[in-house]
Each structure stands twice: as structure tokens, then as C-alpha cells.
A protein has these predicted regions:
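Generic preference for hydrophobic
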Residues: 1, 15, 38, 145-147
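Non-catalytic C-terminal accessory region of glycerolipid acyltransferases
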Residues: 71-182
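A generic secondary-structure micro-motif detector
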Residues: 2, 39-40, 66, 97-99
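Generic detector of short, locally flexible boundary/turn motifs and exposed helical patches
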Residues: 2-6, 24-28, 50-55, 84-87, ...
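Catalytic core of membrane glycerolipid acyltransferases/transacylases, capturing the structured
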Residues: 9-66
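A short beta-turn/loop motif at secondary-structure boundaries
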Residues: 4-9, 137-138
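Proline- and acidic/polar-enriched loop/turn elements at helix boundaries
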Residues: 4-6, 43, 66, 91, ...
């Protein structure tokens, strides 16, 4: 794990890792030293046993229901206001194996700007090959992770959502290329 800067354990953040594997959530929980919750799709809450823990540690969103998505957005804002950090995968899901990095959704960046919470991009280049969605096609090895320095928002205006999205995307994209991406 490479840290670009020391994390203030008393601070709270929105972490934005690239999403490449079904094991990304437990992996992020293992590496980050701060209490946090995830925002994730409602389908995962239906998985036996894992779903129980997921429901208690995530803001669940039904992405097909705009009203539910907005309610989840508000709930995530309340979690941040209470001092918890959030982890949001800006790709909105695990991309297909042949996709290098999916276009990011604006939700994490809108939330960060509305709450004036710093964003920390995280690059995970190896989980896709070591822990693919096809469970028996994985392999052992060393997993690299880079936790980038926080992007300080300093009361950015809402019109900056796209710029923030692009900045985080470029940080992760460039780091994936540095690691030898496709």
C-alpha cells in the first residue's frame, strides 16, 4: 500500500477507488484506518450472509428508482455530517473484464461538493486479475494499492462537479497506466 500523504484519522473523507472486483469492499475495509460506510446497489444486500453485513455497513440504493437514489444520497450526506467517511465507487459498478476504466458518475462529486468533504482517490490495479468476477479464474500474487492525496474542495461551487469528476478520473487513469494498464 502506497500512501501519498498521511491520513488524518480524525478527519472524514469520501474515498473513490476504481471498482474492479467483487472483493473490493472487504479489501478497502482492510486497508483504510478510519470508520466508513459504503454506498452500494440494493442487489448486493440480497446475497446470503454477506448481505446482512452489507446492509449494516452501507447506504443501499436502488439505482433504478430515482426517488430511492435521491433518498440514499441524502442519507449518505447525513452519514458524512455525523463524522463518518464514505466510500463510493464512482464507476457505479464493476466494469466488464475488457474495460480499462468506466466513465465516472457524478454522485460522489456532487456529494463531496455539497458537504464540502475532501475526496481521496484510490487506485487498485491488480484486483481485476487476481479476484475476477469469474470466481475460479483468480490467481495468487501481490496486490498493489495507491491511496492518493486528498483533493481539498475549499467550498467548490456546484458547477465544479464535472471538473472534480475529471480530476479524480485522470488521477486513477494515469496511475493505472503507470502500473502498466491495458
Amino acid at each position: 500500500i502506497e500512501w501519498e500523504e498521511k491520513l488524518d484519522r480524525k478527519g472524514h473523507y469520501i474515498f473513490c477507488p476504481n471498482h474492479v472486483s467483487t472483493l473490493d469492499i472487504p479489501f478497502v475495509l482492510a486497508i483504510l484506518p478510519v470508520p466508513l460506510q459504503f454506498m452500494g446497489k440494493s442487489e448486493i444486500a440480497k446475497i446470503p450472509l454477506f448481505g446482512y453485513f452489507y446492509k449494516n455497513n452501507a447506504v443501499i440504493v436502488d439505482r433504478g428508482n430515482k426517488r430511492d437514489a435521491y433518498a440514499a444520497f441524502l442519507k449518505a450526506g447525513k452519514k458524512l455530517t455525523s463524522g463518518l467517511s464514505m466510500c463510493l465507487f464512482p464507476e457505479g459498478g464493476i466494469p466488464k473484464q475488457d474495460i480499462f476504466l468506466k466513465q465516472f458518475k457524478n454522485g460522489p462529486f456532487r456529494l463531496a461538493i455539497e458537504q464540502n468533504i475532501n475526496i481521496i482517490p484510490i487506485t487498485m490495479p491488480d484486483n481485476k486479475n487476481m479476484f475476477p468476477q469469474e470466481y475460479f479464474k483468480g490467481r495468487p500474487g501481490i496486490v498493489r494499492v495507491k491511496v492518493h492525496k486528498a483533493i481539498e474542495l475549499n467550498n467548490l461551487a456546484e458547477k465544479s462537479i464535472e471538473n472534480l469528476n475529471t480530476s479524480v478520473f485522470n488521477i486513477i487513469f494515469n496511475q493505472l497506466n503507470t502500473y502498466g494498464g491495458k
